[in-house]
Amino acid sequence: MLGDGKEGTSTIPGFNQIQFEGFYRFIDQGLIEELSKFPKIEDIDHEIEFQLFVETYQLVEPLIKERDAVYESLTYSSELYVSAGLIWKTSRNMEEQRIFIGNIPLMNSLGTSIVNGIYRIVINQILQSPGIYYQSELDHNGISVYTGTIISDWGGRLELEIDKKARIWARVSRKQKISILVLSSAMGLNLREILENVCYPEIFLSFLTDKEKKKIGSKENAILEFYQQFSCVGGDPIFSESLCKELQKKFFHQRCELGRIGRRNINSRLNLNIPQNNIFLLPRDILAAADHLIGMKFGMGTLDDMNHLKNKRIRSVADLLQDQLGLALARLENVVKGTISGAIRHKLIPTPQNLVTSTPLTTTYESFFGLHPLSQVLDRTNPLTQIVHGRKLSYLGPGGLTGRTANFRIRDIHPSHYGRICPIDTSEGINVGLIGSLSIHARIGDWGSLESPFYELFEKSKKARIRMLFLSPSQDEYYMIAAGNSLALNRGIQEEQAVPARYRQEFLTIAWEEVHLRSIFPFQYFSIGASLIPFIEHNDANRALMSSNMQRQAVPLSRSEKCIVGTGLERQVALDSGVPAIAEHEGKILYTDTEKIVFSSNGDTLSIPLIMYQRSNKNTCMHQKPQVRRGKCIKKGQILADGAATVGGELALGKNILVAYMPWEGYNFEDAVLISECLVYGDIYTSFHIRKYEIQTHVTTQGPERITKEIPHLEGRLLRNLDKNGIVMLGSWVETGDILVGKLTPQVAKESSYAPEDRLLRAILGIQVSTSKETCLKLPIGGRGRVIDVRWVQKKGGSSYNPEIIRVYISQKREIKVGDKVAGRHGNKGIISKILPRQDMPYLQDGRPVDMVFNPLGVPSRMNVGQIFECSLGLAGSLLDRHYRIAPFDERYEQEASRKLVFSELYEASKQTANPWVFEPEYPGKSRIFDGRTGDPFEQPVIIGKPYILKLIHQVDDKIHGRSSGHYALVTQQPLRGRSKQGGQRVGEMEVWALEGFGVAHILQEMLTYKSDHIRARQEVLGTTIIGGTIPKPEDAPESFRLLVRELRSLALELNHFLVSEKNFQINRKEV
């Protein structure tokens, strides 16, 4: 909440609202809009007419529940029914039926869709808004060339440009351009109409040559000239109806369809009053655009800023789903046409039911959710990740930019982003600046623009209510907007005279009386990720960016803990993520256990199932723990059960632990982190991870594959965990190499491998003897753990195309270990370098050993000083048993407000606990601490405190890898690369130089031959290792050298080479 009751209030909107509003707009408007475009379909003889009656459409409630859809790998969707009629024109009879058109995937309470059992989310795209944009570029002579670009609704472009002789050209492609007179004539105007409708007719007349007059003498001539230039055809084309249709389809429909947004933009830019339903480009638009272009040439008018948000539009979930529905209905139209003509050809009587199939709609949506770049698998690492994913804005995707072609200006922060797109939160790497995040209060308007709320200020009495306005980027340019650092909501109570404000893309300092609007909230400019960083105003923006990305990578811990120092947004994030179970009605708890909570409400008994050990797609563990007791009365909205990484309905991603900023024997050099063994034995940073292993059974040409426990040639210990069906038992502890599912695949053996009696049977009776090969599901390296769930999914119609799938879920308990990555909330990340015994860790004056030692050199150069404030305030909070929620930019209250708050709390903590070392006036915030090994105090006082530290998903167990044996690439005969393929480490050019520098010739030779691509030497090494003996030295060239020779031969170059004998130094020439 913001403000008090008298002045008017503002609440933070729901974080999933963007997705919900988009889907609602699709169901409410887009669905009817697309269905109403479905044309009436007639047969060739015009005897039968098929049409849809849109008004009667119906979406049926899904037959299955969300949870079952995930469990059985199905799509959570609704069936769409529409009334259709078949009219026989000869007898004027009409047959009407309610037909099933297809399934439309629904959105659940998380703002996501479930497709084939997988949570998927559609992210919003930022595109150039359709309309006209004026720009200028310098040509090779340094003269400004003015252009006007008309962008259509489909992204097609038509450029108008004016040359130094003031002639205007329309550029239809990169190479071809035609006169604007020809284009206007081809669109149906004659010369008199053109000259009557422009402001500068004399300029149009000035470049009208005899040749031009001939071209625009008639509409047919103009169309032929235009077609010749547009299609780049040689010779003299002849005017025909088909040529007109082709031009209409290829040019006017694709490049000139503006849509309602484009029509609105062109009307406002060119001061036209053409009706909104006229969504195509008209000759009047072209002439008005040309007039504007001439004005630009003579210094009138302003150029457009292409990166301003008023020139962008948001393509939301609604638009993407509507486009797909249009595509599906176009496919359905073709199917209906084909079926009608087929029925007439075979003299069958069609009905609406058998004309329509549900395949086009269902497959279109399944392929959209599965393949479209803007439809992504929901990242469910922790509750914050789930929410942030749906609020992303992407410049990438169909019709947008690519990571390689986007320039720096597009990626940069623009003043119009203020309060709409977060200036901090973006991805790192090639997509930096192209994938952004919505600010907390931003919303998508009706015209696809991003809107931000502001308070309107009044001159009147203090009793007047404050009014809140949502402004689009084009509207807020005309207002003086104060930057939200003033406390008062009304002008009358303002103390400061001059305030920083924003006006027309500039940041100014103006008198308070001149302000029109003010920001409503300190968080207004930031995304959710950046808003969770306390003291963000004391951090460098690059580090804040890293922090907002790293909080999304935090692993939910087995015992979560609230942060002592937060920003106040933690509760809202947890509630909107849908992770905790929340009471929808008030009532009384009747029964609770780990699986469900039962309570009575208004005489009804309701049961709420809890999530138990569910796997997220990042292998983290989703689990709900009940927080209410039997017999307790609950209110609506109360927390019934906490989910992963939430405590008491608040986000809890990490732990508050005791940290010292000091160097320790070089073990925290370059961002390494030293930790105490208490964090391991106390299960402070222990997390559970659930991995999924699956196997499919197919029907092969030799017969079906079998799931069985009877697997020949395998040791009994590998099969010890299987039940009688050949599937691993629940609760088993499994190690690397154990069989999880026993499976045999039938195969026909070769003649030579038959036993004599089999050969006899085959010769006498012709019986085909088949053998089986084991294709069991084995537990890979690093997968050891406890089996917590086994699912046998059998799809309907068990054909070979729908194989049975067996999924085994294994839970791992992972303590923190050397190589794991930890991070604070200020971009201060590091890798665990050593785990020290608790007695060796530095300890405080009250005898407590610290839990973690960070390098103090990580603070000054990186300018993320917020961590020092958080660290000291966390210590005070832990001693006073207080939690702090601090909004950013608290310096607006007074100078040095953050420092004063921290010092006052430390002083109070030292007084209440009677520990003077907590706040020592000579070096406030620091304390003298002792070396655990010697008991001596360190030379200098050290900053100690309790910051909130997260354990990230980048864990050493997922990354560490070694190759003993594995596959080789077919062409180069070198080991494959990557952990997943059991690959090797590449010894590159620089590594070879390093080994040469050390003079380790034998090791280098091994790396370049035996261990890499010397085929014969590899086999000899295997032999000598088995029988014992000295390993022979390779004498000829390795395979990569032979490959080089072959590639040179393919270029007709022969490379001669010689082998020098090591014994007698004789040159021996060999053919490769």
Curated annotation (Swiss-Prot):
The alphabetized UniProt keywords are:
Chloroplast, DNA-directed RNA polymerase, Nucleotidyltransferase, Plastid, Transcription, Transferase
Q: Name one GO biological process term.
A: DNA-templated transcription
| Chief location | plastid
- Gene Ontology MF terms in the entry: DNA binding; DNA-directed RNA polymerase activity; ribonucleoside binding
Nucleotidyltransferase in keyword set: yes
- In the Enzyme Commission scheme, what number(s) does this protein have? 2.7.7.6
Q: Does the keyword DNA repair apply?
A: no
A cellular component term from Gene Ontology for this protein is:
chloroplast
What does the record note on quaternary structure?
In plastids the minimal PEP RNA polymerase catalytic core is composed of four subunits: alpha, beta, beta', and beta''. When a (nuclear-encoded) sigma factor is associated with the core the holoenzyme is formed, which can initiate transcription.
What does the similarity note say? Belongs to the RNA polymerase beta chain family.
Entry's NCBIfam families? Answer: PRK00405.1
Q: What is this protein called?
A: DNA-directed RNA polymerase subunit beta
Taxonomic classification: Eukaryota, Viridiplantae, Streptophyta, Embryophyta, Tracheophyta
Q: What gene name is given for the protein in this entry?
A: rpoB
